[in-house]
Amino acid sequence: MKKLTYRKIQSFQAIITVLVIFASFYLEYAVGLQPCPLCLMQRVCVFILLGLMGLSLGTVKKAHIVSLMQFLVACAGLYFSLRQLWLQSLPSDQAPACMPGLDVLIQYFPWQTVAKALFWGAGDCAEVTWTMFGISMPGWAAMYFLFMAIMGLFLFFRTRTIN
């Protein structure tokens, strides 16, 4: 794969990622949706992906390592979005109990409780508060992370032969 092609692919992915970040902040601040712990973890994964894409635009020598890291972070984001989709599919009597906001969790609860909420979700993660074309927000996030994981894997195998 040529350097120019690699940079074009990474630039395209970075543009998509910036749009995802803008959409998440728009939905939070303009629409008024409060992100649940799993949403916050997905957002962290998106920011890490953007950082890795920015890093990859600066150097091409370690492109296969950066691409592998992109794949792993995208898989982590895919886990969080699929976990949230699973929580949303549960009947209301089987969904976990709602917890206070993350700021209250961090201030008053032990770190184990905060980590459990961030990695496993809480009752507010099971609520479907927004849909587009019948697909909830974690469904769209899962599609984004799946695309990024596929592209990361593709770039990993293709960048070992950069000229």
From Swiss-Prot:
It is a multi-pass membrane protein. Disulfide bonds join 36-39, 98-125. The keyword Electron transport applies. The keyword Cell membrane applies. Residues 27-44, 83-139 are periplasmic. Required for disulfide bond formation in some periplasmic proteins. Acts by oxidizing the DsbA protein. This is Disulfide bond formation protein B. The lineage of its organism: Bacteria, Pseudomonadati, Pseudomonadota, Gammaproteobacteria, Legionellales.
